[in-house]
């Protein structure tokens, strides 16, 4: 599977859920835009998923896909006097996934705190330090999450509000290593990696996309300007 959005269009190739919108200038906004449209809205969640399911492993062969995805995005704080909340995630989840009930704020639109079973692999770009986050982390951090809002691994993220960020996420199925490289417009670079066997966590086909949330009141907007994704799953060898 391979696709590349240099700008976003409302052409049906993305499934929008909750408070998400594609603007005419080509950006994908989640939430729609608290700075302009919803100044009094509290606790919002929006998601955007690629409409075509992505094969991530093959039960017949045991082969697992490798993938690389890159995207440019922007966080803007509504008012500097407020603490920014809450963040953006790139995630893989079962086909048909919906926004869980009660998953706004720190649950980032992917985690249902009332349900003991959550199925996803995610990279979070979090702007708020919640009680489940390690004390060593500052408010802004990048984490790798597997079926839990408590990160498998996390590192501090030196971000600046209004700075364009570029994230590249690579999964190598030979080593099971998921690596993340963040490059900020201000020159800061953030890296993190973790080991995940996708076939033990996810079904054979998944949805891929983004989720973003705000807290109470909405204090931050998240805009995505471009997104590319390429996955490679080795085909079964033909019998002679």
Curated annotation (Swiss-Prot):
InterPro entries in the record, alphabetically? ConA-like_dom_sf, L-lectin, Lectin_LegA_CS, Lectin_legB_Mn/Ca_BS, Legume_lectin_dom, Leguminous_Lectin
- Record-listed Mn(2+) binding positions: 124, 126, 133, 141
Residue sites binding Ca(2+) per the record: 126, 128, 130, 133
The answer to whether keyword Metal-binding applies is yes
One GO MF term:
carbohydrate binding
UniProt-annotated glycosylation sites, renumbered to this chain = 4
UniProt KW keywords: Calcium, Glycoprotein, Lectin, Manganese, Metal-binding
Write one Pfam family the protein is assigned to.
Answer: Lectin_legB
**PROSITE patterns this protein is in?**
LECTIN_LEGUME_ALPHA, LECTIN_LEGUME_BETA
Q: Tell me the protein family, please.
A: Belongs to the leguminous lectin family.
Q: Which PANTHER family match?
A: CONCANAVALIN A-LIKE LECTIN FAMILY PROTEIN (PTHR32401), OS10G0129200 PROTEIN (PTHR32401:SF49)
Function recorded in the entry: L-fucose specific lectin.
**Name of the protein in question:** Anti-H(O) lectin
| Species per Swiss-Prot/TrEMBL record | Lotus tetragonolobus (Winged pea)
